[in-house]
Curated annotation (Swiss-Prot):
CDD domains named in the record: DHQase_I
Lineage per the UniProt record: Bacteria, Pseudomonadati, Pseudomonadota, Gammaproteobacteria, Enterobacterales
Organism of derivation: Shigella boydii serotype 4 (strain Sb227)
UniProt pathway: Metabolic intermediate biosynthesis; chorismate biosynthesis; chorismate from D-erythrose 4-phosphate and phosphoenolpyruvate: step 3/7
Reaction equation(s) it catalyzes: 3-dehydroquinate = 3-dehydroshikimate + H2O
Molecular functions per Gene Ontology: 3-dehydroquinate dehydratase activity
The protein's name: 3-dehydroquinate dehydratase
Pfam families associated with the record: DHquinase_I (PF01487)
Top EC group: lyase
Keywords noted in UniProt: Amino-acid biosynthesis, Aromatic amino acid biosynthesis, Lyase, Schiff base
InterPro entries linked: 3-dehydroquinate_DH_AS, Aldolase_TIM, DHquinase_I, Type-I_3-dehydroquinase
């Protein structure tokens, strides 16, 4: 399997990498949160742009991105607008969503973008091509905060992301039972062993799914999300606890 390298970080080998999400509604809070996050132990900074109030002002959005880049220059920066339909804070049109991601790509300030699989096939393919032309990696994602589909469907979605040339396919699902967590883990393992030619990220959410956030190295998930302050999704644990467990499992 090929790995993905962003700055000096190699994703897809060794212990799962830790991603933290920064959620701030204005530039002042972006600045203060960035200073607080700078001391935390993580690998990738995800900026959840759907929490930012002044979305219609692209200059304001990019000014905030510049603050993050300058405050933590060594950390890979993942630009994510999570749509309302997949659990995000704001609803915007597909056109606005694509334009926002294109602006991030063109800015030269971000290393990675999150692109939702179900945005529309043509728009997704075009945006991936645009990102790659600017040496920006694409995490292609799908989130279901209500249920966990069958393993075959999970694998089909991840394979579709791979066929669209996502650098890292990602899926996050809500379990209704412990067996749903096993479904996610089994699908992850099958994808990793039989189909994946690049790193994937998978997780089962809420308290029920916490094991999936810790056992990525065993089953084939290359990264996991931790919390510096407020969790960006149900079931996230603190980065310090997360690093401890990931290290124990890696060294066992």
């Amino acid at each position: 399997m090929k790995t993905v390298t962003v700055k000096d970080l190699v994703i897809g080998t060794g212990a799962p990498k830790i991603i933290v999400s920064l959620m701030a509604k204005d530039i002042a809070r972006v600045k203060s949160e960035a200073l607080a996050y700078r001391e935390a132990d993580f690998d990738i900074l995800e900026w959840r742009v759907d929490h930012f109030a002044d979305l219609s002002n692209v200059e304001s959005v990019m000014a905030a991105a510049k603050i993050l880049r300058e405050t933590m220059p060594e950390k890979p920066l993942l630009f994510t607008f999570r749509s309302a339909k997949e659990g995000g804070e704001q609803a915007i049109s597909t056109e606005a969503y694509i334009a926002l991601n294109r602006a991030a790509i063109d800015s030269g300030l971000v290393d990675m973008i999150d692109l939702e699989l179900f945005t529309g096939d043509d728009q997704v393919k075009e945006t991936v091509a645009c990102a790659h032309a600017h040496d920006v990696k694409v995490v292609m994602s799908n989130h279901d905060f209500h249920k966990t589909p069958e393993a075959e469907e999970i694998i089909a979605r991840l394979r579709k992301m791979q066929s669209f040339d996502a650098d890292i396919p990602k899926i996050a699902l809500m379990p209704q039972s412990t067996s749903d967590v096993l479904t996610l883990l089994a699908a992850t393992l099958e994808m990793q062993e039989q189909y994946a030619d690049r790193p994937i990220i998978t997780m089962s959410m809420a308290k029920t799914g916490v094991i999936s956030r810790l056992a990525g190295e065993v089953f084939g998930s290359a990264a996991t999300f931790g919390a510096v302050k407020k969790a960006s999704a149900p079931g996230q644990i603190s980065v310090n606890d997360l690093r401890t467990v990931l290290t124990i499992l890696h060294q066992a």
